[in-house]
């Protein structure tokens, strides 16, 4: 990954592997790495975006732990998550639902992207082509919020405005169209 600052969650526990579709392993991995997570949240941080795909183990289990820590520090905490494709199976959908319910407890706003819509919006037929397009939707959501704060075109909108609008706002959905 080209990301300059990253944390490998639960290195001892997972030995560099994923959570094997087990959210409890993902949760424990985040707890193992909580001191590193805390260090990322220190300083001038005022807003945190937590993005993940729900339904597997790492994102489903770790994201709520990270969100809880961020929110406990008074940071504006925004989750931007994807629901698994239907063909990924009922188990993934059930884990995703449980993960969303847990995530809601620890974020100010939760933006949910249903991966099934990717096929319709982008005209994609192939699962492997749809994955980067789902990532693009997540990035666009985060960038859109950040741009509102940072753009001079929105002179009357600053972090305080976004904070007040998004603090405790609950679930949001992204509409997609072309």
Which residues fall in each region the model found?
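Tubulin/FtsZ superfamily GTPase core signature
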Residues: 1-178
């Amino acid at each position: 990954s080209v990301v300059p600052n990253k944390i490998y969650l639960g290195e001892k526990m997972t030995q560099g592997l994923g959570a094997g579709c087990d959210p409890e392993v993902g949760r424990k991995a985040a707890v193992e790495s909580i001191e590193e997570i805390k260090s990322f949240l220190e300083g001038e941080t005022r807003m945190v975006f937590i993005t993940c795909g729900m339904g597997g183990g790492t994102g489903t289990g770790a994201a709520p732990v990270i969100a809880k820590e961020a929110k406990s520090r008074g940071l504006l905490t925004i989750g931007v998550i994807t629901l698994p494709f239907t063909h990924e199976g009922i188990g993934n959908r059930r884990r995703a639902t449980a993960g969303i319910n847990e995530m809601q407890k620890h974020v100010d706003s939760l933006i949910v992207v249903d991966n099934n819509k990717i096929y319709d919006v982008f005209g994609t037929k192939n699962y492997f082509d749809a994955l980067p397009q789902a990532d693009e939707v997540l990035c666009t959501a985060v960038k859109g919020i950040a741009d509102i704060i940072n753009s001079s075109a929105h002179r009357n909108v600053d972090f305080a405005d976004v904070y007040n609008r998004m603090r405790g706002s609950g679930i949001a959905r992204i509409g997609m169209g072309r």
